[in-house]
A protein has these predicted regions:
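A short Gly-Trp-Pro
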Residues: 1-8, 13-142
Length: 142
């Protein structure tokens, strides 16, 4: 039996599930992620979009990413909790708020991205890959 990875909002109305493990896990320091999460950075797990099963109604927050391409953050219509995002620069992937993923998921970031917009008080552990903007690779591509 395959593991199922499920993320949901606080009230449980908005959820997304996947039957495959994430293809990448990143900590994003971009201003948009700071604004949407209300934190100095966002922990994101990227899953293949075609493997998703979503339920519930969401409110869309449309923005333009650093690539100049659109991205859409999706929040629960009832509790306003951010759960996942689509990013046109990462076609075919969904970025899921790692803190919304239920056990047995364990967040293990590959890298910190958009560190040029990092909050001054945020420290990045030594030995971790860091990129001032987007990583030079596309998550999920070999």
């Amino acid at each position: 039996m395959k593991n199922t990875f499920r993320a949901q909002c606080q009230c449980g109305q908005l959820a997304v599930s996947f039957t495959q493990a994430p293809v990448a896990q990143l900590v994003c320091h971009c201003r948009d992620c700071q604004t949407v999460s209300g934190l100095p950075y966002a922990k994101a797990a990227f899953f293949r979009a075609e493997e998703q099963c979503s339920e519930g109604e969401f409110l869309a927050v449309d923005m333009t990413g650093g690539s100049g391409k659109p991205k859409q953050y999706r929040r629960c219509r009832q509790c306003n909790d951010f759960v996942y995002a689509t990013v046109d620069a990462l076609t075919g992937l969904l970025g899921v708020a790692a803190d919304k993923l239920l056990p047995p998921f364990e967040f293990k970031p590959m890298a910190h991205v958009w560190t040029c917009e990092k909050a001054p008080e945020t420290e990045i552990p030594s030995g971790v890959f860091q990129f001032p903007k987007a990583p030079p690779f596309r998550p999920g591509k070999q």
